[in-house]
Every structure is written in C-alpha cells, then in structure tokens.
C-alpha cells in the first residue's frame, strides 16, 4: 500500500533528516513514498471442519481434445472449443452460435436411455455436434438466474450430478453418464446422474455456484436442493435430520357456523370412534407422505475427502414450502387436540376440587358461628350429618342385609 505524506508530515521529516527546501535532494524528491504493509494474520485453524473454505468454481477446464471456458459476469455463457472428430453433447435448444467450417458440422438429435431417465425426470433429448475440422461453439440456457461450472474428469474421481437439469453439456469419448436413483432420499431428489471416465462437464445451477472442499475427517450438512454435484468416495452421503427442524405457525381456523356445530348429527359423528380412527389414519398417511415423498426437511451429510458444488438459489419459495408443507405445519390431528384438552382439564381438576373444599369450609364455619343454640364445630356437625345419613341395612333381590352382620362376618373371615 502506498502512503503520501502531507505538508506537516513532510516538514517533520525534513527537520529530522536535516534536509532543507533548497537542497537538491528535496527538489529531486519533493514527495517521499512510504510502503506500509499490514502484519499477516494467522490463518484460521480448522477445528472439526468448522471453517471450511468456500470458493468460486474455476472458469475454464481443458483436456487434450476440448476446452470449456465460461464467459460473462456472472457466468452466463459457455464457450466450447472442439478439436477434429470430437463429439459435443448439449441439451436441446441451448446452442447459441458456432464458428468454423459450417459445412463440415454434423448435428443430430440423440435420445439417451429414455426409459430410465423419463421415470425420474432427467432430460434425455440431447443435441450431438461433431465436425472433422476444429470448431468453436457457444452454449447458454434460457433461464436468466443461472450460472455455469466446468469440471475436468481425469478418470481418478467419479462425480454425481444431483440435480436433474444441472447437466448442460459434456464431451469425451470415454465419458459415461448413467442415471441413478437414491431411494434414501425423497422422490423429488431421485434424479441423479453418475459420471465416470475422462472428459469435460458443463454444469448449470440457479444463482451462483460455489465449491466446498472437504478434507479427510471433515463433515458438511447441505440441503439436497442446493447440491449441484459432488465427488464419489468410499462413504456415500447419508440422509440427515436435525433434532428440531419444525416451524410452528399460528393460522386462524375456519369460521364454522354455530348452527352446524350445534347439530346433533355432527356432534354424534365427530364423537364416534369410527370418525376418530379415520381422521387419525388420514393424518398419519398425510404426515408420512409429506416426510417421505416431498421431504423438504431432509438433509445430506457428506464426509471428506470430497468436493461439493453448491448453488446459491436452491429452489423457489413454492418449491421450498408448498401448500402441502403449510398444511402439515398448520394441521393437527383432532384426536390429539381433544386429548390435550382432556389432559389439561384432568390436571386442573384437583386444584378446582381443593378450591371448592376451601370455599365449603369457610361457608360452613360462617353458618355454624351464626346458627342459634349451642356452639359446635364444623367437624362435629359433619359427624352428626354422617350419623344421620348412615345406612343400617340394604335390600337386594328381595332380601334384607344388615350392615352389622356384614361387618361381623368380615371379622370372622379375617380371624
């Protein structure tokens, strides 16, 4: 960094150095340049992979027969340089322009495993471009919020393209791309492609694409919608759920007319066991479907060494939280709500009984104190009431049974 001294600082410097204004040294060097360098800070130590280096992806990759170069800020177009007799596969409708001998260029529509790719939603229509002479092509996409990332495969490390439409173009005679289904994830994240061999890949992601490098022993948790691609190692990424990933929203309920609520038929229907069992079954099925099929709360855990390509815009708001997710957050099973209310009433009932007992005790004391005649206590009055209402005999099936005889028979049986 270059620092220019002001007049005051220059005068102080001249006074200390003994240089006058008329000195030829001063006339030759009217301003003194001072080089100031900041002291280098220590690099942050990586503790259990907390401070992971996140960097932008390389803008170019080259092999012996081709070269991929990303142009634009942000990366918005791919420049492909092909040698003679080299094949380029790109998604249909993404070729922008081409330079070279156009008469030698051969373009055909290739259908790549439609039966396997169509099931999981991976594009299977690609445009194959080849020429006996060197050519240069420009490839782009229609979406305005995408960027490119290029990957060079040397045959030592295989890659897995996690997003369905992330694979834009590739070249390489030994490069093989096979669709894969990861049954550990939800259906929305089943469309993956395994890439093996040697060649160049051009991937496209929403927003910006960044690279995360994991060393041996490091771990990283990422959402499947943000993972563009990753390297394959001995330890495959495993599904991961956080201990608490639920969001609680308060959504106002429906204003059901009171006349309908007071209907005897509706009350009997909602109070029946069949209704409760059916509602519980439907709620369990909906919860299972939301967690298993859509699975927006499911993450992936990666173990190093590995390289991840992450896109900044994983999904739209509608994809992140659909109507089904909102219903899952807002809905609660009717049986569970009623059980909670019953439990709350059961918890509060003992305190209510105690309050009633206290009020009864106070009222009884006031009544006894104000009653005419000899003064009596509340306990004595209670004993008198019990004595008056004491039962001596009961009639069962036309027979009279005395309580004293029952007590005597019970004592004899004990002895």
From Swiss-Prot:
The keyword Transit peptide applies. Transmembrane segments: none annotated. InterPro entries: AIM24, AIM24_sf, Trp_RNA-bd_attenuator-like_dom. GO terms for cellular component: mitochondrial inner membrane. It is found in: Mitochondrion. Its main location: mitochondrion. GO terms for biological process: inner mitochondrial membrane organization. SUPFAM superfamilies: TRAP-like. Keywords: Mitochondrion, Transit peptide. The gene is aim24. Residues 1-33 form a transit peptide. Belongs to the AIM24 family. This is Altered inheritance of mitochondria protein 24, mitochondrial. Gene3D superfamilies: Mitochondrial biogenesis AIM24. It comes from the Eukaryota.
């Amino acid at each position: 960094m270059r620092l220019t001294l002001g007049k005051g600082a220059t005068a102080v410097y001249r006074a200390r150095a003994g240089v006058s204004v008329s000195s030829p040294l001063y006339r030759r060097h009217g301003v003194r340049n001072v080089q100031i360098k900041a002291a280098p800070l220590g690099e942050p130590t990586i503790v259990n992979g907390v401070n992971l280096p996140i960097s932008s992806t390389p803008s170019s990759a080259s092999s012996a027969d081709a070269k991929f170069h990303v142009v634009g800020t942000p990366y918005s177009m791919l420049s492909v340089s092909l040698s003679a007799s080299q094949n380029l596969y790109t998604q249909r409708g993404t070729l922008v322009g081409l330079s070279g001998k156009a008469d030698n260029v051969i373009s055909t529509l290739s259908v790549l495993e439609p039966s396997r790719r169509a099931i999981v939603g991976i594009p299977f229509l690609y445009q194959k471009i080849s020429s006996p002479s060197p050519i240069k092509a420009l490839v782009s996409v229609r979406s305005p919020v995408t960027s490119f990332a290029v990957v060079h495969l040397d045959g030592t490390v295989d890659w897995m393209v996690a997003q369905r439409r992330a694979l834009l173009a590739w070249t390489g005679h030994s490069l093989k791309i096979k669709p894969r289904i990861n049954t550990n994830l939800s259906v929305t994240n089943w469309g993956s492609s395994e890439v093996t061999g040697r060649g160049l890949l051009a991937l496209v992601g929403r927003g910006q694409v960044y690279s995360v490098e994991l060393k041996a022993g490091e771990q990283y948790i990422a959402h499947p919608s943000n993972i563009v691609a990753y390297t394959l190692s001995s330890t495959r990424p495993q599904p991961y759920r956080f201990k608490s990933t639920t969001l609680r929203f308060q959504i106002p309920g429906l204003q059901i007319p009171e006349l309908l609520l007071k209907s005897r038929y509706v009350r009997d229907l909602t109070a029946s066991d069949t209704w409760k069992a059916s509602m519980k079954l439907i709620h369990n099925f909906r919860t299972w479907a939301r967690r298993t099929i859509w699975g927006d709360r499911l993450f992936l855990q990666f173990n190093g060494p590995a390289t991840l390509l992450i896109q900044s815009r994983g999904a739209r708001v509608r994809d992140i939280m659909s109507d089904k997710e909102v219903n899952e957050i807002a809905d609660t099973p009717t049986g569970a709500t009623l059980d909670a209310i019953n439990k709350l009433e059961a918890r509060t009932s003992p305190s209510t009984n105690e309050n009633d007992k206290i009020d009864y005790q106070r009222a009884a004391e006031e009544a006894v104190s104000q009653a005419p005649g000899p003064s009596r206590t509340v306990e004595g009055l209670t004993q008198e009431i019990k004595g008056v209402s004491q039962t001596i005999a009961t009639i069962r099936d036309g027979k009279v049974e005395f309580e004293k005889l029952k007590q005597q028979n019970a004592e004899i049986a004990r002895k």
